[in-house]
Amino acid sequence: MANKFAIITGASTGIGFELATLAAKDGYDILVAADEALIESAAQDFRQFGTSVDSLEADLSTFEGVDGLLAAAKGRQIDLLCANAGRGLGEAFLDQDIAEWRKVIDTNVVGTSYLLQKVLRDMVARNDGKVLVTGSIAGYIPGAFQAVYNGTKSYVDSFVAAIQNEIKESDGVTLTNLMPGPVETEFFDRAHMLDTSVGADPKKSDPADVAKDGWDALMAGKAAIVSGWKNKIQSAVANITPNAVLAEQHRKMAEPGTAE
């Protein structure tokens, strides 16, 4: 119980897996969660670093799933939260199944907002704690053939910036937005995007590099970090580019059948 305690969501693979690895290496006891059974084997990997590791398979798109995650903390003070759980979805919006696009919104928007509200209340009350949220530079770009996902990340990016302002008097609490671009993870397979230009691109970011960027920014108390120099340029250009142009550019990356 002497170690600090961290919760990392979406930790079975990708960025979340790498964030959990960094937390365990840094001496945090961790509770890791994901919506798949693979989280159990991921937890085994994290135990090699000698801290306490608990895992939970949970649907964090629901209030019940988030409540179950917090209950699994067993009353321990949450010193660090990596709110990384997210869901993608490609293809044309009109062709998407309603249940699938609603799951994206419920996971990325509803679940993330609820988890942050529950955790940040306690952190702000004691004026101590760290939260890293996985947003995306996709939030700056109208996502043709990825419309719902990009819309949810626009919400996350804006939401985090707003909450940072609301809690600015709590100088002991750090809230950081990690904004990567395309990352080499299972995301594109799960989002039905392997036949797209961006899904097939072999030059996507390494999740370990993205996680390290986010971790370093969090520990330095930064408000936000865009991971990767190409993504920094893209996010900056997006602020001065008309939406119609951005949407057409995104279409070329995300339209099904564009993979080379």
Each model region followed by its residue ranges:
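Conserved glycine-rich cofactor-binding loop
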Residues: 12-13
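Active-site helix of classical SDR
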Residues: 116, 152
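SDR active-site lid
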Residues: 165-229, 240, 244-247
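Substrate-binding pocket helix/loop in short-chain dehydrogenase/reductase
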Residues: 92-93, 97-105
